[in-house]
């Protein structure tokens, strides 16, 4: 089993940003050119990227497709993309840019059977479902709406519909650089057989080890590598040993 590191490139208004718990206006990082940042992570050895269109996720306005095409065209790395993908045409448009995998959040939660249809059309490996959890409950609409479901029951449902992987985000620790709580990840991993990528609060090499020990197939790292709290090269070297 390999453990993959996904540096995060979050897009907001044409810039590369990092928010605290996904709250608009809480930027702790705001950089002019997302492509420059993506190239930087690739130059450090990253062979995976996690790109989120925050304009799409928060406001439903997907304005960053040109930036996405530039990143995909420039780099030969595995790219997964989410944020504001709310229709079949959105899925087709994003996959048409050349990305490897789309992340379905609100769309999947509104209409779970669509996951099965998309997995059959594009293949399970290209369809990831996002389970973003706050206080034990799954959220939608860019983390702004809390649902009466927990991640485990939904994870089982989406696996049965053919999702190839799950992105599990712990919003309670997202963007705070205070470390991870591996137990919710472990519980989800034990309930499903498809890969689970963990996100939220990864800020040290120990956090990466904890998530690997919990059974995660990889981790998204954002704020910590932008602020220098965590060295991406060291994280990538550690991942090779897990």
Swiss-Prot record:
Its EC number is 5.3.1.16. GO terms for molecular function: 1-(5-phosphoribosyl)-5-[(5-phosphoribosylamino)methylideneamino]imidazole-4-carboxamide isomerase activity. One of its GO terms (biological process) is L-tryptophan biosynthetic process. It is found in: Cytoplasm. One of its GO terms (cellular component) is cytoplasm. The active site is at 10 (proton acceptor), 132 (proton donor). PANTHER family: 1-(5-PHOSPHORIBOSYL)-5-[(5-PHOSPHORIBOSYLAMINO)METHYLIDENEAMINO] IMIDAZOLE-4-CARBOXAMIDE ISOMERASE (PTHR43090:SF7). Pathway: Amino-acid biosynthesis; L-histidine biosynthesis; L-histidine from 5-phospho-alpha-D-ribose 1-diphosphate: step 4/9. This is 1-(5-phosphoribosyl)-5-[(5-phosphoribosylamino)methylideneamino] imidazole-4-carboxamide isomerase. The lineage of its organism: Archaea, Methanobacteriati, Methanobacteriota, Stenosarchaea group, Methanomicrobia. Keywords: Amino-acid biosynthesis, Cytoplasm, Histidine biosynthesis, Isomerase. Pfam families: His_biosynth. It catalyses: 1-(5-phospho-beta-D-ribosyl)-5-[(5-phospho-beta-D-ribosylamino)methylideneamino]imidazole-4-carboxamide = 5-[(5-phospho-1-deoxy-D-ribulos-1-ylimino)methylamino]-1-(5-phospho-beta-D-ribosyl)imidazole-4-carboxamide. The gene is hisA. It is an enzyme of class 5 (isomerase). Belongs to the HisA/HisF family.
